[in-house]
Structure formats: C-alpha cells, structure tokens
Curated annotation (Swiss-Prot):
Lineage, highest ranks first: Bacteria, Pseudomonadati, Chlamydiota, Chlamydiia, Chlamydiales
Keyword list, A-Z: ATP-binding, Chaperone, Nucleotide-binding, Repeat
Record keyword Repeat present: yes
Ranges of Low complexity composition bias in the record: 151-172
Species annotation: Chlamydia trachomatis serovar D (strain ATCC VR-885 / DSM 19411 / UW-3/Cx)
Ranges in coiled-coil conformation: none
Protein name: Probable ATP-dependent Clp protease ATP-binding subunit
Region called Disordered, residue ranges: 151-182
Domain (UVR) ranges: 443-478
Region (Repeat 2): 81-145
Source species, domain of life: Bacteria
Length: 854
C-alpha cells in the first residue's frame, strides 16, 4: 500500500500518528491525516488548503471540538489504522492511477480522505465552510501550474459516481470542470514569481533606508520610452536587491511618478521555472506564458535577481536560452525588466552578449559609507530586536559599521555590518537567555513520572498509574506557570547588545582582538618591554621600538590604513633579530604559529615574486595562490618576518611598497589581502662587515658616540642597497648592537635553564657555578658570530657528557643532583651529595666523564 508513497506522504503519516498520540487516541483516523497534511507545511495539498483559508491551528481546534481528547490511560505503541483510513489510502492510490501519476503524494492523500463521505476530516472541512469540490478544483489547478501531464478528461472516471454520471462528467476530480469546458489556468506570474509590492504591503520585507540616488536613477530609467530596463551592478552584499525593494516601498507609498504608480513589482524565480522541465519546449513554454501575461496586464515590472543566469538558462542541444527569448520583447518595450548581478558576472556573461547588454541600462551600486551604514542599521534595528528579544544600543550600531569596515575583509558594507549585528544579538540571546535550571529539573521530573506511569500501566498497577497521572498533571501545571512567568520576565527585561558584544563577534570571526582593553591586557602591554627583554638579551632599543608600535595599535591611535608597525632590523648575525620577532608572536599574537617567516634567499630570481602573491592565470600553480598572501588571508593578525632581505632580487622589494604604505597587497586572483593588522619586520646583515672591521669600536660599544658612528656607517650601507622610497615607508630602522660579555653570560644562563628543564624528565638537577659559565662565555666569545657559538659550546661542554651519563644504566635508578666543576679546561660532572663523579661506580676507581672524553 505504501510502496508508491513519496517521502512527504510518509512524513504526513508520521505526523498524523503524533497528532493521534497528542490527542490520546489509540487509532489513526482521517482527521489525523488532515492534521498531518497541514502540519507538514509544504506540498500541493498544503498549498491548496491554505489557498482556501484552512491552516493547522484552525483545523486542530475544530478536531478537538468535534472529538476531543481520549482517556489518559492508554496502550503504548503506534495507533491502529481505522477502516476509513485504509480505504482513503486505497482511494489515494486509485486517484494517482487515474491521473497517470506513478507516485502517491500529499495531493492524492487529500483526495483520498475527501472520498470518505462519512469521515471526520470531511466533516471538519465542511464545518470550516470549505467545499470539497473547490478543493478538487484547486488541486487540479496546482498540478497544471507545474506542467504535470494530466490525462485526457475522457479517460478519467470520477470517484463515488455511477456509470451514468460518469458519462455526463469526465473531470478527473469528481466531475467538476474548471470554469466551463476549458480548464482555467493559474497565473504564471503567481506560479513562478513573488510580488514584492504585495509583500511590502504585508510588512514581510525589511524597510529600506537611504539609497535615494540609486532608487531615483532606477525610476528615471523605468520612465524612459526605449531601453527602459535597468540593471544594478555591484559587489555582493552592497544592497542591490534592497534597492529594488526600496522601489517597491515607494510604489506602495505612492512616492513615484504617475507612470509607475499602479505598477506591480514581481521577482521572477528562474530556478523554479526550470525545475521539473523534462521535455524540450516546456521551459520555453513557461517563459512565453510569463511574457504573455506581462503583455496582457501591462502594469508588471519583472525583477530578475542574478541576471547573468538567463544566459544559457534552459539551453540544450539546439535550443535557445532565456536571454534569446527575452531579447525581442525587451527591445520592443513589450516587457520591462530590472536585473541585478555582480561586476564579475556582468563582465563574464552580459558584456559578452552585446545585443543583450544594450537592452539594459547599467547602474553601478557602490558600497555605502560607514555613516550611511549606521543609518541603514538604525532602520533595521527594530526587526533584529524583535527577533532576538534584545535591546540594541546605538553604540552597537556604530561599532558594527566601523569594526566591520576595519576588520572584516573580502566582503562589503552594509552586508557585513548587518551580519555582525545579527550574530551579536544571537550571541547575547544564547548566553543570557538559557532556560532556568528550575525548569530543566522540573521537565526531567515530569519525564521520570511519565515513565513510571507507563511502567505501572504495563504491570497493570492501575491505582499507582492513576496516582502518577495526577502527580504528572500537577507538575505540568506548575511547569506551565513557571514557563509563563519566565517568558514574561524575558519580555520585560531585555538584555542590551552593546559595543563590547559586537567587538567580541569580530574577535571570534577574525582572530583580531577588537574588544576594549581589559585591565589585565593593559597591564600586559605596559610590562611587555620588560617581558621581552628577559628573552631578548642586550637589545633594549629594538624591544622598545616594537613595544611602542603594539601599544599604538591596541589603543587605536595608529594610522588605520597602514600596518601596525614596519621595522628594518640591522646588525651583525646572531644578535637576536629573528628571536625578537618570534618572542613578539608568542607574547602578543597567541603563539609562534602567528609568525609568518619568509626566507628572502628563496627570492633571488626576479620571477620568484610569483611565489609570494601567486602565479598569473594560465601558469602552473595559479590555483594554489601565493605563499605569503594565502597565509596572511587566513591569519590577518600576525607578525610577518622577511628574513635577510638583502638576498632577494631588488625588483621583488618593490612589491612591499604598497604593503608598507597602504597595508594591502593584491594577489593573483585580484583579491586585496589586508596587512593592516600585521607587524612587518625585515632583517638584514647590511653593514655587518663594518662592525667587524671597525677598529674604533671593537667588541662591545661603550659610549653613545660609538653607537652613533656605527649607526651612520650602517645607514650609509642601507641607502646604497635599498631604494629611498622603500626606506621612507619604514616606521623605524633599528640597529642591533654587538653583544657584550655580560649579555652573553645571561644568554648562557637561559640556555642552561632550557637544558635543566629537559633534564627534569630524567630526575636530574644541574648546578652550574659562575666559574663554569665564565669558561663557556670565553669559549663561545666571537664578535663576528654573535650568540650562536654559545649553542655549540653548550652542546660540546654540557650536553655531550650528560647524554653519555643518561646512557649508563646505573644513572637512571634514582634522583640525583649534579654539580659541574671546571678542571683543566674541562667540565666535570659530580654528584653534589658525595662530591664524586656522577659516572663513577662507588669503589671502582673510575674517572669522571669530562667534555673532552665525550
């Protein structure tokens, strides 16, 4: 019986069973099927019933009035099908066969229950003053709307009629023709379009604020004698559809010229028009039907959103597409059409067809300014307050416009500002308006009581079941009162959506800390310099420059169109230039993964620039994008480190000019990648040879005059290698000083601390005296190489002998403290408690392990 039922028809039966259970009925009748059809909310049957004024709530109240609720105590399980329902299902199958449909849908189910003359469903409809014959007529209209092939009327026999009546009437739906001999067709515009003017009268559209210039130009083009078909062209999200809705608003309010006052603005749904066309000519037939109706009425303005879809729409082997069908009528002025599409789609599809392009008059729609966006948000404010049940402050509207313009890239105002406001409202509602815990506990208690009641029924303890039923009833009454009080409190005490809520949404979406500074973060920014100087030794001036840039950015006083800071780090190798960039990423940007490191030695050739922003179209790797641009696009809040820029080709440095000045770079896809929330750091060894050769300075600068001299020489080397327009765009050029012995000593301490933390896994504690540290500094002292030789010294004199110790089985068995001792240019490790070598087995006379032996 159910083999041919569609998914919607099966869903109707499930909903009908739920309605039967809700009414405490242990059977499934035609009235439940009717309620299931209406509750589904979609399908031919629902459309027909709604057209005739029947909705779910009305039918539900009528069913409850007619048959009421069943007894509380009932057998669990699915309700049984009544005889009438079984007959209605059989009748539905027969109706589908008569209509030559190979499926049973909601329309057939509705016809099936109508054929049960003594069913409750038919009585419900009659009480609601709905004529079953009208339902049959409307079903046929609906089927004709979607071009379903109905069989010849002579081949269909009406239900519940004898042979004599069949000979008199040949209608497929009960012997009633639609409007005489010729069936009446539903309006093609109603079938495939939406009346925007009608929707605005019913307050189903959002109000349109501003855009007066665009709406005025739209009206002027529509009032022309020839070529009066405007097309709105603009980026996605700038408000093209809203401008058309603004025209509908003006038509309804009468604020248009006399020529447009009685016009109806109808949106044409091209996808709906194409859907279901199985045979050649069906699509063309539907378009011609729409065009004929527009010609007939004479007061219709068609609106086609995504106008580029008419190019190629419906075209198959040898067939013509929608654009070719519309061209003659557009040229003669028989129909008026408003289009909307994006700039890219207009260029790709419309401009290629010159004949189609000249029939439309282009109106370029630019994104509104921030101030205009705020006005638009004020107009939409009430709608979002009602939806989220919150109160939106004026500061939140301004913040949504400004923050979306500053931080959300790749999208356009006002769309991105509206999205921010919408999500902020949802965030506040979800976080503050959850169901109270008392209600949750009470609902759990009701469910527990209900299960106990059903268990008592199953064991035939009817007295206990009756007691539990009364208890459940009291709990439900209490729950209803609590919910009513909670709902009223929600309406009375609306939670505000403020500037901070909008900023939090921006932070979640982009990863950029747009929220106001907290006290903890302010303290962190003030002490950032001290924190970095503990990690980057001996470079206080460079650390101070970076910290100043970060403070300017987080307090909002920096130039919003440039990066947070752009620095050129100069000085000899191994003095902490790259390390400082890494520590900034860790301390302020959330981790070392926020550091985008670009090794400029990979860009020695001129053509290597394509790796940075992507290969041009047609070249290998175009789809992959640029190594730099893709990383910044995914993580816009980061540190970008260009390491050793002097090794790159000079022409490649020209790419960085717009990054430093305008905070953006255009990739191979034409997208503008935003660098305004990044810190740009470039390192270079230019002039390092001057430090090595300078006999005046030696190792370690001991006077301000020394530093001034070396700075002057390095600046001269930089100007010789880099272009003036590049140098002038930098915020600051920072010269790192050569490391003094005191700084090297601190660095050795840091390296030993790292080693000690690694040895904690082996239950080993290190004690390194100052004499050993001085020895290591002396061994690692190299003015030309900076601090890097210290790493090799630590490896040679400390890590190598310790590694051999760990490989000895006797050293793994207990916790120990090791003390390093300097002996004849060697470092020896001893147990601190016994003052003997950690590797000596007690009493065997073996020698301690030293660095030289290892």
């Amino acid at each position: 019986m159910f083999e041919k039922f569609t998914n919607r028809a099966k869903q109707v039966i499930k909903l009908a069973k739920k309605e039967a259970q809700r009414l405490n009925h242990n059977y499934l009748g035609t009235e439940h099927i009717l309620l299931g059809l209406l509750k589904l909310g979609q399908g031919v049957a629902v459309n027909v019933l709604r057209t005739l004024g029947v909705d779910f709530d009305t039918a539900k109240h009528e069913v409850e009035r007619l048959i009421g609720y069943g007894p509380e105590i009932q057998v669990c399980g699915d309700p049984a099908l009544t005889g009438r329902v079984k007959k209605s299902f059989e009748s539905a199958n027969e109706e589908a066969a008569l209509l030559e449909h190979n499926y049973v849908g909601t329309e057939h189910l509705l016809l099936g229950i109508l054929n049960q003359s003594d069913g409750v469903a038919l009585q419900v409809l009659e009480n609601l003053h709905v004529d079953p014959k009208e339902i049959r007529k409307e079903i046929l209209k609906e089927l004709e709307t979607f071009n379903l092939q109905l069989p010849p009327s002579s081949s269909i026999t009406p239900r519940n009629t004898n042979s004599s009546s069949s000979s008199k009437s040949s209608s497929p739906l009960g012997g009633h023709t639609l409007g005489g001999d010729k069936p009446e067709k539903l309006s093609a515009l109603k079938a495939y379009g939406y009346d925007l003017t009608e929707m605005f009268k019913e307050s189903r559209l959002d109000p349109v604020i501003g855009r007066s210039a665009e709406v005025e130009r739209l009206i002027l083009i529509l009032c022309r004698r020839r070529k009066n078909n405007p097309v709105l062209v603009g980026e996605a999200g700038v408000g093209k559809t809203a401008i058309v809705e603004g025209l509908a608003q003006k038509i309804v309010s009468g604020e248009v010229p006399e020529a447009l006052r009685k016009k109806r603005l109808i949106t044409l749904d091209l996808a709906l028009m194409i859907a279901g066309t199985k045979y050649r000519g069906q699509f063309e037939e539907r378009i011609k039907a729409v065009m004929d109706e527009v010609r007939k009425h004479g007061n219709i303005l068609l609106f086609i959103d995504e106008l580029h879809t008419i190019v190629g729409a419906g075209a198959a082997e040898g067939a013509i597409d929608a654009s070719h069908i519309l061209k003659p009528a557009l040229a003669r002025g028989e129909i008026q059409c408003i289009g909307a599409t994006t700039l890219d789609e207009y260029r790709k599809h419309i401009e290629k067809d010159a004949a189609l392009e000249r029939r439309f008059q282009k109106i370029v729609v630019q994104p509104p300014s921030v101030d205009e966006t705020v006005e638009i948000l004020r107009g939409l404010k009430k709608k979002y307050e009602e939806h989220h049940n919150v109160f939106i402050t004026d500061e939140a509207l301004v913040a949504a416009a400004k923050l979306s313009d500053q931080y959300v890239h790749g999208r356009f105002l006002p769309d991105k500002a509206i999205d921010l406001l919408d999500e902020a409202g949802a965030r506040v509602r979800v976080n503050t308006m959850g169901q109270p815990s008392d209600l949750v506990r009470l609902e759990a208690e009701i469910e527990k009581t209900k299960q106990a009641k059903e268990q008592a029924i199953g064991t035939q303890e009817y007295e206990k079941a009756a007691s539990l039923r009364d208890e459940e009833k009291k709990l439900r009454e209490k729950l209803g009162n609590m919910k009513q009080q909670w709902e009223s409190n929600k309406e009375e005490h609306q939670v505000p959506v403020d500037e901070e809520a909008v900023a939090q949404v921006v932070s979640v979406q982009t990863g950029i800390p747009a929220a106001r500074l907290t006290e903890a973060e302010s303290e962190k920014l003030l002490t950032l310099e001290t924190t970095l100087q503990k990690k980057v030794i001996g470079q206080s001036q460079a650390v101070a420059s970076i910290c100043r840039a970060i403070r300017r950015s987080r307090t909002g006083i920096k130039d919003p169109n440039r990066p947070m800071g752009s620095f050129l780090f100069l000085g000899p190798t191994g003095v902490g230039k790259t390390l400082l960039a890494q520590q900034i990423a860790i301390e302020m940007f959330g981790g070392e993964d926020s550091l985008i490191q670009v090794d400029m030695s990979e860009y020695m050739e001129k053509f290597a620039a394509t790796k940075m922003m992507g290969s041009p179209p047609g070249y290998v790797g175009h789809e992959e994008g640029g190594h730099l641009t893709e990383q910044v696009r995914r993580r816009p809040y980061c540190v970008v480190l260009f390491d050793e820029i002097e090794k790159a080709h000079p022409d490649i440095m020209d790419l960085m000019l717009q990054i430093l000045e305008q905070g953006r770079l255009t990739d191979s896809f034409g997208r503008k990648i935003d660098f305004r929330n990044t810190i740009i750091i470039m390192t270079s060894n230019l002039g390092a040879d001057l430090i090595r050769k300078s006999g005046e300075i030696g190792f370690g600068l001991r006077s301000h005059m020394d530093y001034a001299v070396i700075k002057e020489k390095i600046d001269a080397a930089v100007k010789k290698h880099l272009k003036p327009e590049f140098i002038n765009r930098l915020d600051e050029s920072v010269i790192f000083k050569p490391l003094e012995k005191e700084a090297l000593s601190e660095i050795i301490h840091l390296e030993i601390n790292k080693l000690g933390s690694r040895l904690q896994n082996y239950q080993m504690d290190l004690n390194i005296p100052d004499s050993v540290i001085s020895f290591l500094v002396t061994k690692g002292h190299s003015p030309e190489m900076g601090a890097r030789p210290l790493r090799r010294v630590v490896e040679q004199y400390l890590e190598d002998p310790l590694a051999e110790m760990l490989l000895k089985e006797s050293c793994r068995q207990e916790a120990r403290k090791l003390r390093a001792r300097l002996t004849e240019e060697r470092v020896v490790f001893e147990r601190e408690e016994e003052a003997v070598s950690a590797l000596a087995i007690e009493g065997d006379g073996s020698e301690p392990i030293t660095a030289d032996e290892s």
